[in-house]
Design a protein with these regions (language model features):
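Membrane-interfacial helical/loop segments at transmembrane boundaries in membrane proteins
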Residues: 69-84, 206-222, 412-423, 513-547
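Hydrophobic alpha-helical transmembrane segments of polytopic
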Residues: 10-17, 41, 45-55, 95-102, ...
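Hydrophobic transmembrane alpha-helices and their helix-loop junctions in integral membrane proteins
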Residues: 108-152, 158-484, 502, 508
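Membrane-entry segments of alpha-helical transmembrane domains in multi-pass membrane proteins
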Residues: 2-16, 36-47, 83-101, 139-152, ...
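Hard-cation-handling environments
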Residues: 460, 467-468, 473, 482-564
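Aromatic-capped, Gly/Pro-kinked transmembrane alpha-helices
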Residues: 82, 87, 512-558, 569-676
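Hydrophobic alpha-helical membrane-insertion segments
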Residues: 47-63, 187-200, 394-402, 495-518, ...
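Transmembrane helix-loop-helix hairpins at membrane boundaries of multipass inner-membrane proteins
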Residues: 1-11, 15, 27-128, 201-225, ...
């Protein structure tokens, strides 16, 4: 018999980081007179996130071991007709897992920030923001209704805007945060349309009530069209996910988010904003399962993102941007799994990816600190001798990312590839090719970065920006010195070690329970009569050890190994090869360097085109038709008519007599003509 979780305990989970954020933001900044210093600021915010993590871990234990569940409304905000707008929580396996991932990664980022942002003037403000980010994501994942989900959705978007543009005196950061904000508005427009359609046709925003009416919705068409209503709803919802989870073509904001400080890059890419779209689709699985058209659309978008965003990672030289493009590619893998109805596999990869991606981002930040804020991997090399902890943990994160057997990424990534192979959707063939090819691409660019940073010759003195401030921030006073690389302080390396542990073991420990047990039983719905993917995976699974051993005979393992070997040869053994290939394939390199010209298209076709259209409508519609014809034309016409009638009013009696005689004559003529 399942137990019920305590509402007050659950409420404390999001409120703890919110209180820490409020105290830091009010008392630790100029807004509140800087009443508290840096030490008290990070103590309060870390304490809030630590409390949230402990309570989340306790909740996960109750859900996984005791079968506890919670689905209640805490507060009714308003009721409009029969539509209630409520604040409530739904806690099941999916929610509990997300709560732990969000709070643990956030806790690591908070600790890391103490060292990374030590000399930044906005230290207290940054801690207030990242705690607020944590609160927003927790409210999103714990929601039991779509209105609260939407508020959490918009809150993470707002705080990401503040954090990407944290250094507001840096023009590129301001451009990046505005870009992220605007691109996400496009996705959010679709998202709110989907929610509105559910509210209009299901009459509720509550998950449980809406899912109970899913079958009824699937029988309806959109009024005035022949489109299936459930398909329109699902595609609208997924457009929202395309924005938040950076799926092609709404992916363009994510690489530019690297303009923010490294700690927030880790939090955005690992556990908060970009995972929101994947979580939302998994939560809405009872709806998506009823539309194969939507599932095909999702699978195609995910496959394009997984493969083609990986290609862009190959030509990046900024260490953070390499990791950013790997995030785009891995989000594509998760999306492909959603399209294959393998929702549990998608969120399983979300979980494993959160740990090793946070590790890789924080490891990149540690390298940036050790290299005195140089971010160009072409001017590094041999760093492992100076930064052993960062080296080992980054290696573990890279091995997890490429899906090395027994590492966490292997269990989730290989499960995605197998799920797509078992899918019978029309898009599955293309998607399977994309995720297989993506294995080689991921291994290649991941170990290109690894080899260029940690191995080979030291190339620090070759950096033309060494004395020109090629930095990712403005807070390091020793960024221009001539000292060599150095290991980061313990407050930076300890989070790396703590993240490396789940990056290695969490997949091995949890795959049986999460994918083939009943952990997601009440949280995720799969129509087994139509979609047999999870049944096929369960039949082929014989334990994590057997799965890892069997992997050495499969294509993904050899593709990953080939990617590592090719990268090793090109960047350590024969460094002249990349330049030669670049010259031979120059047109392709130009396309990749310009990111498929998506930014050019968005700016010159969409943005400038919309502006030109607006100017045209203003000139023709507003100035010519409205002002020129209707407004100004009407008074000119009145003036002309009045000027003409004024001439008739001469004031002379004989003029009026003449008009009267003419009028009588015309009337008599008319009547005579009628009587003929």
């Amino acid at each position: 018999m399942s137990q019920t979780l305590n509402a007050s305990t659950l409420l404390a989970v999001p409120l703890a980081p919110l209180v820490g954020s409020a105290l830091a933001g009010i008392l630790g900044t100029q807004f509140g007179g800087n009443w508290i210093g840096r030490r008290l600021t990070h103590t309060l915010t870390i304490l809030g996130v630590l409390i949230a993590f402990i309570l989340s871990a306790s909740t996960l234990k109750s859900v996984a071991v005791d079968g506890a569940r919670f689905n209640e409304t805490l507060y009714t905000w308003m009721a409009v007709g029969g539509l209630k707008m409520e604040v409530g929580f739904m806690v099941d396996g999916l929610t509990a897992m997300m709560m732990c991932v969000v709070t643990f990664v956030s806790l690591m980022v908070h600790l890391y920030t103490i060292g990374y942002m030590e000399e930044d003037e906005g230290y207290n403000r940054f801690f207030a923001y990242i705690s607020l980010f944590t609160f927003s994501m927790l409210m999103l994942v714990m929601s039991n209704n779509m209105l609260q989900l939407f508020f959490g959705w918009e809150a993470v978007g707002l705080v990401s805007y503040l954090l990407i543009g944290f250094w507001f005196n840096k023009p590129t950061a301001i451009f990046a945060n505005m870009k992220a904000f605007l691109v996400n508005r496009v996705g959010d427009f679709g998202f709110i349309l989907g929610i509105g359609l559910i509210a209009a046709f299901a009459g509720t925003l509550n998950y449980t009530e809406a899912f109970a009416k899913a079958a009824d919705l699937s029988a309806l068409t959109l009024p005035g069209t022949s489109w299936m209503l459930i398909t329109v709803i699902c595609i609208c919802l997924f457009i929202g996910a395309m924005g938040k989870s950076a799926q092609f073509p709404l992916h363009v904001w994510l690489p530019d988010s690297m303009e923010g400080p490294t700690p927030i890059s880790a939090l955005i890419h690992a556990a908060t904003m970009v995972t929101a779209g994947i979580f939302m689709v998994a939560r809405m699985s009872p709806l998506f399962e009823l539309s194969e058209t939507a599932l095909n659309f999702i699978m195609v978008i995910g496959a394009i993102t997984a493969l083609f965003m990986g290609f862009l990672g190959i030509i990046q030289n900024d260490i953070k941007r390499v990791v950013a493009y790997s995030t785009l590619s891995q989000l594509g893998y998760m999306t492909v799994a959603l399209g294959a109805s393998a929702y549990s596999v998608a969120v399983f990869h979300l979980m494993t990816h959160a740990f090793f991606k946070a590790l890789l981002f924080l490891g990149a930040g540690s390298v940036i600190m050790g290299m005195h804020h140089n971010q160009d991997i072409r001017y590094m090399g041999g760093v492992r001798k100076y930064m052993p902890i960062t080296w080992i943990t980054s290696l573990l994160g890279s091995l997890a990312l490429i899906g090395t057997p027994f590492f966490s990424g292997f269990y989730s990534k290989d499960s995605i590839i197998e799920a797509v192979a078992e899918s019978h959707l029309p898009a599955a063939g293309f998607a399977h090719f994309a995720v297989l090819a993506g294995v080689f691409v991921t291994a290649f660019y991941s170990f290109r970065m690894y080899f260029l940073v940690f191995h080979g010759k030291e190339r620090y003195d070759q950096n033309p920006d060494a004395h020109h401030g090629h930095h990712d921030d403005h807070h390091d006073d020793h960024g221009h010195d001539d000292h060599g690389p150095h290991e980061s302080p313990w407050v930076v390396t300890v989070p790396l070690i703590l993240l490396a542990i789940p990056s290695v073991v969490i997949g091995y420990m949890t795959i049986d329970t999460m994918l083939f047990g009943e952990f997601f039983k009440d949280a995720i719905f799969v129509d087994g009569d139509k979609h047999h993917v999870m049944h096929e995976l369960a039949d082929a699974f014989h334990g994590p050890v057997a799965m890892a051993l069997h992997a050495v005979t499969t294509a993904p393992f050899w593709l990953a190994l080939a990617g590592v070997v090719v990268s090793w040869y090109m960047y350590l053994i024969n460094p002249a090869v990349p330049a030669a290939i670049g010259r031979a394939l120059r047109p392709l390199v130009v396309i990749l360097e310009n990111k498929y010209f998506m930014d050019w298209f968005n700016e010159n076709v969409l943005a400038r085109g919309a502006r030109a259209l607006g100017n045209g409508l203003w000139k023709v519609g507003d100035r010519t038709l409205i002002d020129g014809l209707l407004v100004n034309g009407s008074w000119k016409l009145v003036g002309m008519v009045s000027a003409w009638t004024r001439k008739l009013q001469s004031g002379y009696l004989y003029h009026y007599a003449l008009v009267m005689i003419l009028g009588i004559f015309l009337l008599m003529t008319y009547f005579v003509w009628l009587n003929k």
